[in-house]
Amino acid sequence: AGFVVDNVDTVVAIYEAVCESKPLVRKILTVTGDAVASPGNFRVPLGTNYQQVISAAGGFSEDPEKVISGGPMMGMPLFVLDIPVTKNSSSILAFKKDPVAEEATTPCINCGRCVTACPENLMPTLMMVASLQKNTERFEKLYGMECIECGCCSYVCPAKRPLTQGFKQMKRKVNAEKRAKAAKAQGGK
């Protein structure tokens, strides 16, 4: 027995796909943050440019220091707004001040808070070392691919280490290496 937690947009998309045979062509995006002129929720076609969605929210009230695609804990920073809305898009956050940049990252103090906070019972401290060393084999042995990228470890870290971002990058690296290895194996036959 377990639970499935989904947002309303996903539930509606499932209903429309199953009961009405409608493909997913629109997405509801939340545009918010202290740098957004008129925050709100916007239902936009997939492929719509992020800049167009921000314009629909009245644009920026002032130039943001930080723009994030996704939530505050699991979102990724945006450096360009000329990207399309996809089925995985959920929100655009724009902040006048970067809340993370105000506190400098310091070396890990091995307090173990990230280990305690991890809902998957992983070892973020060791995974981060493997990530910094770009050691994909070690990262996999530490079950780094099981990370759900929830952001809990980064949130509780007193050293303000970008743990979740490091794990996301490392998982992409592992997957890219696996694809390259598979392609090489297929090409060698």
Positions of predicted regions on the chain:
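Hydrophobic alpha-helical positions that pack around
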Residues: 1-50, 56-61, 71
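Catalytic cores of large soluble enzymes that bind and process phosphate-bearing ligands
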Residues: 2-10, 23, 41-45, 84, ...
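Structured core elements
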Residues: 4, 30, 41-43, 52, ...
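Short, mixed-charge, low-aromatic patches
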Residues: 6-13, 82-87, 124-126
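Flexible loop/turn segments at secondary-structure boundaries
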Residues: 37-39, 51-52, 74-77, 100-101, ...
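Active-site gating/interface segments in enzymes
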Residues: 58-109
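Ferredoxin-type iron-sulfur electron-transfer modules in oxidoreductases and energy-metabolism complexes
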Residues: 89-105, 115, 119-189
